[in-house]
């Protein structure tokens, strides 16, 4: 009788490294390790040999970067999705795509089970398992971190050392790091105390603002229907544009985020993020929307932005609601075409200029010079009608 097969999400980190051996021993199963390239900078060429050495029978490496940018990141950017107005959702956006890739691999390899290395009090367990249920409800899902005997990262490290499993986490380097092209999340260690400033060694790519260049960097980003298409006058793919903005932003200390956020499971957590390109692009996109969107659309879209961010954060990417919101967002983005010029300086992003063929800014109406075409006399009648309801209310209630 052939062994059962388990497809697992494999990153090469502490949890998934020891998970291979633990699952193999517990279920006497073959392990198919799946790694998705979402633009992480850490070395990935040695992951296959590491997974096999740890006990996996097969390793699948999938380059998901193009799909990640075009089908996930750009949708979130067009929606203006920032969780609780801060987090650009790098990890949260990557999880449904990675989970989908694991399901596809599992079905192709004849696996009967899926496994992830998410903790029992984190968000990612929800994101993976809801996606698994959406795409392959017939496959059994295993969550080793919710049931195994290890109670701390220290005990996991000890298990790894006992079984000669190579891991980068040590008691001297206790950070848990997740990375993709849209951002890096850093947690654990001293970061769990919200009164402790993040040590410099916690940051992975960004220069400290104090040590950033004394000369500002100026960038020009061109958008077409809400999607960035060129940087400094050069047309480029979305992937290349994000990579370049990450380099420029990181060098200038842009994109460091420190927040207390509300997790799906009901607790608050302290998270450190590095997201240079995401910070720059969300800022530029929002300023172009200010120029091109009609007032009621611009103001209402803020509600949609938060709803969209919540959907991503809560693991509901494949829900009908997300698809329905996409239809609204896509309609709003038709005029969001134009150029935005920004200054990046010592961690800050500031606006230098913007223009668009669909600009709703009319200088002749806005100016206070003699070229003013605004009908000032019309204001009196407008104000009378605009305030008539409150005037009537006041007259009635004052009289009583």
UniProtKB/Swiss-Prot annotation:
Stored SUPFAM superfamilies: Adenine nucleotide alpha hydrolases-like, Argininosuccinate synthetase, C-terminal domain
EC numbers on record: 6.3.4.5
Ranges annotated as spanning the membrane: none
Enzyme class: ligase
GO molecular function terms listed in the Swiss-Prot or TrEMBL record: argininosuccinate synthase activity; ATP binding
Protein residues bound to L-aspartate: 119, 123-124
Sequence positions that bind L-citrulline: 87, 123, 127, 176, 185, 261, 273
Pfam families: Arginosuc_syn_C, Arginosuc_synth
Keyword Ligase: yes
Pathway the protein contributes to: Amino-acid biosynthesis; L-arginine biosynthesis; L-arginine from L-ornithine and carbamoyl phosphate: step 2/3
Protein name: Argininosuccinate synthase
Species for this entry: Pelodictyon phaeoclathratiforme (strain DSM 5477 / BU-1)
Gene name of the encoded protein: argG
């Amino acid at each position: 009788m052939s062994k059962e097969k388990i497809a697992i999400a494999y990153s090469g980190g502490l949890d998934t490294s020891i998970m291979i051996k633990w699952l193999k021993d517990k279920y006497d199963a073959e392990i198919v390790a799946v790694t998705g390239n979402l633009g992480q900078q850490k070395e990935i060429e040695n992951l296959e040999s590491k997974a096999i050495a740890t006990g996996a029978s097969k390793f699948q490496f999938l380059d998901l970067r193009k799909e990640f940018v075009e089908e996930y990141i750009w949708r979130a950017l067009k929606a203006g999705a920032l969780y609780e107005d801060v987090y650009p959702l790098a990890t949260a956006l990557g999880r449904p795509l990675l989970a989908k890739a694991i399901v596809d691999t599992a079905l192709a390899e004849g696996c009967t089970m899926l496994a992830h290395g998410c903790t029992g009090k984190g968000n990612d367990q929800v994101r993976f398992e809801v996606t698994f249920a959406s795409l392959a409800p017939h496959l059994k899902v295993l969550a080793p971190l919710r049931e195994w005997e290890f109670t701390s990262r220290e005990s996991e490290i000890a298990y790894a050392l006992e079984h000669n499993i190579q891991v980068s986490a040590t008691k001297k380097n206790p950070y848990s790091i997740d990375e993709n092209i849209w951002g890096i999340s850093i947690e654990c260690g001293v970061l769990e105390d919200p009164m402790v400033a993040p040590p410099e060694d916690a940051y992975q790519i960004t220069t400290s603002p104090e040590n950033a260049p004394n000369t500002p960097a100026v960038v020009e980003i061109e958008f077409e229907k809400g999607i960035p298409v060129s940087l400094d006058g050069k047309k480029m793919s979305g992937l290349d544009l994000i990579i370049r903005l990450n380099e420029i932003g990181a060098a200038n200390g842009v994109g460091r985020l420190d927040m207390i956020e509300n997790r799906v499971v009901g607790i608050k957590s302290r998270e450190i993020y590095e997201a240079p390109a995401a910070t720059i692009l969300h800022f530029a996109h929002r300023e172009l929307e200010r120029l091109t969107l009609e007032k009621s659309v611009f103001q209402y879209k803020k509600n949609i932005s938060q709803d969209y961010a919540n959907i991503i954060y809560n693991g509901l990417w494949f829900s009908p609601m997300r698809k329905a919101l996409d239809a609204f967002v896509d309609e709003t983005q038709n005029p969001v075409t134009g150029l935005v010029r920004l200054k990046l300086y010592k961690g800050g992003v500031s606006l230098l200029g913007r223009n668009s063929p669909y600009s709703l800014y009319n200088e002749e109406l806005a100016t206070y010079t003699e070229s003013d075409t605004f009908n000032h006399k019309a204001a009196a009648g407008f104000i009378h009608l605009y305030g008539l309801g409150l005037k009537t209310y006041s007259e009635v209630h004052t009289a009583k």
